[in-house]
Amino acid sequence: MAPVSREDVTIGIDVGTTAAKAVAVDESGRVHARARIPHQLLVPAPDRLEHNAEEAWREGPVTALGRLNRPDAKAVAVSSMVPSLTAVDTEGRPITPGLLYGDSRGRVPDAAEQPVPAVGEAAEFLRWTAAEAPGAAGYWPAPAVANHALAGEAVIDFATAITSLPLFDGTGWNASALADRGATVDQMPRVETFGKPVGQVRGTSSVLATGAIDALCEQIVAGADHDGDVLVLCGTTLIVWITVAEARQVPGLWTIPHTAVGKSQIGGASNAGGLFLGWVDRVVAQADPLGADPRRVPVWMPYIRGERTPFHDPDRRAALHGVDLTQDAASLRRAAYEASGFVVRQILELSGAPVRRIIASGGGTRVQPWMQAIADATGRPVEVSAVAEGAALGAAFLARMAVGLESVITDAARWAAVERVVEPRSEWVRPTNDRYRHFLELSGSRLV
């Protein structure tokens, strides 16, 4: 094979909950370089979740880009979690905490009744932030802070902006809605379509491109585009999407458009991902969950800071049921991963959609006990994506669009690759099923 021209490389940067990740990728989707810059997830109170936005949203992306050492990259694009918000000064530097999804300062009444991710959370973030820093130069979400740090352009994509409803009405910033929260249009970032050129990265010839929401970036390169394809995003947040032929509403779940024409996705986000599993890892003695006895596993309720889909209950809390003297640290750790798998299965069953295959993506795919628990809990093989940095990979594809190397977003599916397939284990099927039924009863699921 002829060597790939260095001119063909683009870069995707993902501002995540626990780290900024960056990948340099060629036209075939092969990763030539990667970087990960960790940052702290701050929990100043049980119902609060924030970043030091200077560290996580500004310094992290710039450092990650520098670590790749590819100043010749054709373009760079940023993906990020939503919603998020901070106030910035005239130099684009954050001056308030970086508020993150699920923080009580964005709490919206009746969120459980909404068929899409909660509308209004970002607006409540703005209300709090504007009161903390009235007259700030700007009120920006994470991608605007990162893009300004990279290229001096405070810009976000339309999908990110739409999550700010009612602040953004689909055509532009709503002056009246902003005024109600203490802000003006000129304090908000510019909004552009994803995959468009919007600037030049400092110190390079690279074009800055608009990226997109992290989950969207992961989805376009996952290959979960056919009816019954399930995408499980294993990050700090656990996200499950089932591809369906037509949109329909399911109580407790979200329905959103798919990037594939004529398709929709049903599912949602859960706190039973890395946020919960990381806490378990810190408080439970080290042991190998793969060595646990299938008959000696308790049941975790993984609601360490409330739950999103399908309950939308910020006041739920974690609990451990059925602990006895025959169990050990391996049993407790297996129970935690199993709880995450139970959440996946519950969302699949609530959706009522036929399941064809399960594809897992995200940093958690490196954790084999997690992948095994999802396979055991669902009773289905789990296809593990070859590139764990799925959001950064998708952003790199959008960067290609900005410089004319790609024209159709659905072509990103050619970058989908499976590293391994994790099969459910026969000796775990019956005991795991029994615990799943107990999990549903304890959680008050309407599947009982």
Predicted segments — roles?
Residues 37, 42, 99-106, 160-162, ...:
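Short, acidic/turn-prone active-site loops that include or flank metal/cofactor-
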Residues 72, 184-187, 354:
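Short loop/turn motifs at secondary-structure junctions
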Residues 52, 103, 214:
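Short, conserved phosphate/pyrophosphate- and ester-handling motifs at nucleotide-, phospho-/glycolipid
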Residues 70-101, 116-118, 143, 147-168, ...:
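Short beta-strand-loop/turn "lid" adjacent to the catalytic site in phosphate-handling enzymes
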Residues 11-12, 21, 107-155, 165-180, ...:
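Active-site core segments that coordinate phosphate-bearing ligands/cofactors
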Residues 33-37, 189, 321, 420:
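Structural signal for short hydrophobic segments within the conserved structured cores
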Residues 40-48, 155-161, 184-185, 324-330:
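Gly-rich Lys/Arg/Thr-decorated short loops/hinges at beta-loop-alpha junctions or inter-strand turns
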Residues 1-95, 137, 203-210, 375-382, ...:
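N-terminal glycine/serine-rich phosphate-binding loop of ATP-dependent small-molecule kinases
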